[in-house]
C-alpha cells in the first residue's frame, strides 16, 4: 500500500505529531522520524500511532492504542513529573499484545529494508527527517537558563535513543507492556541507517488567523487560556492515494461520548513552522526494483505476501476494532504541514481532500499549589508545573523569559496601546499585554509617575479567567487547600464574595498599589491551579481564611485579643482581610504563597542553621547538602563559617554556584548569609573571597563578621604596639559565646601562651573590613553589645532577626524566623486635631494616632502566634520543635519616613527624633501586653519562661542604664500592672520587635523601609520575572568572562554565553502621586540630586523628595541608638556614603556604633560606583 504520512504541529506548544496509517498485520512500509534534540522513534502498524512532543530538548515517545488517552497526558514529562506524576493506563493487555506484535513485525521490516539499502547502495525504506527546535531559544525549552529544566539534567543528543524508552514508560502508569512497546519503537529507529537521511530544508511558517466567530465561540476547557485554546480536530477518512494526503479518522468512542461532543467545526490548515525542517527522498525506480528483488524470497514465503490487501479507508467514529489507522490529538490546535519538501522541492497536490473537521475532547490541565523552583525540591507539592501562556509548555512561571520589545512610539501612544490590550485580553490573550507592560514600564513611569497605578491594574488582566467564577467557588472545589479552609469557603462563600467585591470596587483590582507590588503579588505570592491565576485579592482572601480557621483551632483565644473582638470565623476573616488588603499588616511572601494549602511547605522565610555533627566527613556531606536543600526550596539561610568544615573557600564556591544556578528558577528572593569571627584565621580567606570574586554572587550571598570590643580597643591604641591575632579554627572556637570580661581574659591568655595564630595589624584588618563593607554585602556585628532576656546558661536563641545572621549561641538544627511588618502609614489619620492623649498632631491637618497603632500591634501579635502554630504543626525541617521553645516574634516596622513626609516633617527634624523614640517604646510595651493577654485568655507561656528574666518581672528596657534608656513615656501605673500580670500569668513569647529593613515588605506596600530613610524616589528592583539578554549584554558577557575576540563570534555563539536574568521594574515613591505631575516628574529626573534643589515653595513637595542620600548618617545612628532599648532583636543599620565620600568614613561609623552600644554597626552600605573603597 502506498500511503503518505501527515505531519501536524503546534508551534506554540512546541511539538509535532506524525500519523502513518499501516495495515493490520504491521508489515507495511516503515517510516522513521528523527529529531534534532536527539530523539528517535519507530512507527509500527495496526492500531498504533506514534508521536513526539518536544519539551526542553527531550523527545516523548509513545506507541499504543489511544482510545481514551490524549497527548497532553503522555508527552515528555517535566523534571519533577518523571519522578512523581502517574498517568492512567490506556490499553488493555490484549491491545498491548497486539501492538507489541505489530511493532515486532515493523522491526523485522525495518531490518529487511536496511539490508536492502546496504545491498542496493541507498534507497530502501522511505525516510522522513524532521529537525525541531523551539522558537524561544532561551526561556522555554531548556536553552540557556530557561523556565523549565536545568540544562545539566537534559539528556545528551547521542543518548536519546536509549533514553526514549524510559520516557515512554514513565508516561503510562508503569505499564510493562507499554514500556516494551516504546522500547521496540525506539529500537526500530535505532536500526535505521543514518546515511539514508537527506539534508533538512527550511519550511516557511504562517499561522492561521481564526475567524472572529470561531475565536469568540470556541469551547474552552477549565484550564486553557482564551488566547491559545483551539479545539482538537480529526479529519474524515477517505481513500488514500499517492497524490492525496492520507485522511485522519476520528477517535473511537462510545455512543454516550459521541453524544457529548459538540458539532464539529472546520479548521484551516496551518503553514509550516520555520524551525521545522522536513525532507523526504523517494528511492529511485531501479533501487526500488533491486530492493524488491533482494527481499523477494522472504516475501513469497511470508504470510503477509499471500494475505489480501487491507482496506484503504475505514468509517470514522465507529467501534470497529480493525481500523487501519488511528490518531488522537489533544485539545490544542494542531496545524497541518502542507509545505513538505521532497529532495528540496516543494510538494504540490492538485487534488486536496476536504478541510479536516475538529472534535473537542476536554482534557484536564495539570495544576500546582505553588510555583517554587521548578526543580526536584524537597516538598513535592511545591513544584507542580503550570503551562506558560507563550507556548503552552509546562514550567514554573506564567510566561517564558521575556524578549524585550523595542518600540519608538511616544509614551502617550504606548500607554493607550496597553489599555487596548487590557480591554481586549479575553480575545487576544495576555501575552501581548504582558510584553508591552514589562518592556515599557521603566520608560513610562519615569515619563509620567502617575501611570504606575494604571500599569498595575492592566497587569492584573494578565490573569487567566479571573472573573470566570466567584472567589469562593475558586477555592471551595480546590483539593490543594486544607480541608478546614475549603470548608470555610463552602460555609461562608457569600460573605467572602461580598467582602472581596466591596474591597475591589473601592480600591481597584490592584488594591491601590503600583506595578512592582502587583507583579510580586501575582508572580511570587500567587499560585496557579484549576486553570486560573490568583490575583492580589484572591491571595489575601486565602490567607485570611487560613488565619480565621486557625483561630477556631486555639479555642477562640485569639478572638479575645483581636482589636475588632470577633465572635466567629466570619468576623475574624473580615478583620484579617481588611488588615491585609490595606497593607496595614504585611506577612512575608512565603506566608502569602503557602498559607491555607495542605502539605509541608515551610511558611517561614529564613532559618539559622547549625550542623548537628562536627566531624569533617559529616559536615561536608551533611551540612552543605542541607544548606543546598533549604536554598533550593526558597529559604534564606544563616550559617557559621566554622560549621562548614573543610576548605572554607571551596565551600563558599560550592554554595555560591548553587545559589547562582537557582537564580533563573527561583520564586522567592533568597540570601545565603555566612557569619564568621574576626579572631579566626577563616576571616583572612573570607576577606579575600569577598574582594576577589564577591561580585559574581552579588545579591545571592552575604556575610556578617563578629568584632569584639577588644579588637576596637587595639585599633584605637595610639601606641601602635598592640597587634591582632587570628587563631586556628579549633583554637578560635574557645572564644565563641563568651561575655565581654571572659572573652578578654581568655584571649589574652591564649596570646601569652603562644597558641598557633596569624598576627596582623589592627589597622590592616580594619582596612580589609572597610573594603568588604563597601561592597554592600557585609555586615559588622558587635556581639558583646547584644542583650537577651534568656540567660546564657540555658541557651540563647537567634537575636539578630531575619535581616542579620546569628551572633552567637543558638541551638543545633534549624531555627525559623517569621518576619511580620506593620505599616505606620496606616496610623496617620486625616482631619483636624483631636485633643487626646493617644493622638500626636504634627501639622498639615494630619495626626498620628497611637490608638490605631495599638490595634495594629495587637493584631500583629495574634497573627504572629497563629503563624507559629502553623509552623509547629507542619514542622518542616524540624523547625517547629525549636520554635516552640521560645516562640520568638519578629515584628518589624515600615513607613516611618513616609509618616514624616505626610506630617510635613523631614527625617532629621527634632519632632522626628521624639516621635521615633515614642513609637518604638509604645510598640514594645503594647506587644508585651498583648502577649500577656493571650496567656490570661488561656494560652500557655513559652516553655522556657520560668528560667527567663520575665519570671522576675523584668523587661528588655530594664537591661539598659537610665542614661541609655532615656525618659519613660509610659505611665507608672501601666508598667506596674504589666509586671504583675507577667509574673502571675506568664508571657506567650520571648522576643517581639526587630529592627530589620524589610525592603521587600516596604516595596510590596509601596512605602519606606523600616525606620530608615527612603532609598530613592525611583529605583529598580528585581522581580520573579525573567528576561532573555540582549545581543549587547551577551557580547559584554563574552568579552568580560570568556576573553574571545568579539568580531570572530556569530550570533549563535553569543546565544550560548548569555543566561536569562531577572526583570527589574521601577519602585516609585508613592508620595510623588500626591503632588503635581510636573514636580513629580522633575523629582524623578533629578534622581539622587533632587533633594539638593529646594526651590519649591510647597513644604510637602520638598519633604517628599527627601531620600537617604541626603539624610545625615549621624541622624540615622542617633535614632537607632534611641530605639535600642525597645528593640529586642538587632537593628539592620544602613549607611549611605554619598558622592565625594570614601570608605574611611565607614571606620568612623563603626567606632561610633560600638561605643554607643549598638549590636550591629553596619548592616548594608550603599556607595556610588565612583567612590574609591580600597
UniProtKB/Swiss-Prot annotation:
Mind telling me which PANTHER family this protein's record contains? RIBONUCLEOSIDE-DIPHOSPHATE REDUCTASE LARGE CHAIN, RIBONUCLEOSIDE-DIPHOSPHATE REDUCTASE LARGE SUBUNIT
Protein's GO biological process: deoxyribonucleotide biosynthetic process; symbiont-mediated suppression of host NF-kappaB cascade
Q: Which UniProt keywords apply?
A: Host cytoplasm, Host-virus interaction, Inhibition of host NF-kappa-B by virus, Late protein, Virion
Key word Hydrolase present: no
> Sorted alphabetically, which InterPro entries does this protein's record hold?
HSV_RIR1_betahv (IPR034716), RHIM (IPR025735), RNR_lg_C (IPR000788), RNR_lsu_N (IPR013509), Rrm1 (IPR039718)
Q: Where is this site: Cleavage?
A: 277-278
PTM annotation, UniProt = Undergoes proteolytic cleavage, generating two peptides, a N-terminal and a 116 kDa. The N-terminal peptide retains RIPK1- and RIPK3-binding activity as well as cell death suppression activity.
Annotated localization: Virion; Host cytoplasm
Give the protein's recorded name.
Ribonucleoside-diphosphate reductase large subunit-like protein
Q: Where is this motif: RIP homotypic interaction motif (RHIM)?
A: 50-72
Q: What is the protein's known function?
A: Provides optimal viral replication conditions by promoting host cell survival and avoiding the host inflammatory response linked to NF-kappa-B activation. Blocks RIPK1 ubiquitination, thereby preventing NF-kappa-B activation and virally induced inflammatory response. Prevents host necroptosis by targeting RIPK3 thereby preventing the formation of necroptotic RIPK1-RIPK3 complexes. Also inhibits ZBP1-induced necroptosis. Does not have ribonucleotide reductase activity. Betaherpesviruses probably use another strategy to expand the dNTP pool in a quiescent host cell.
Which lineage?
Viruses, Duplodnaviria, Heunggongvirae, Peploviricota, Herviviricetes
**Which species is the source of this protein?**
Murid herpesvirus 1 (strain Smith)
Q: Where is the composition biased (Low complexity)?
A: 182-202, 233-243, 291-316
Similarity-based family: Belongs to the ribonucleoside diphosphate reductase large chain family.
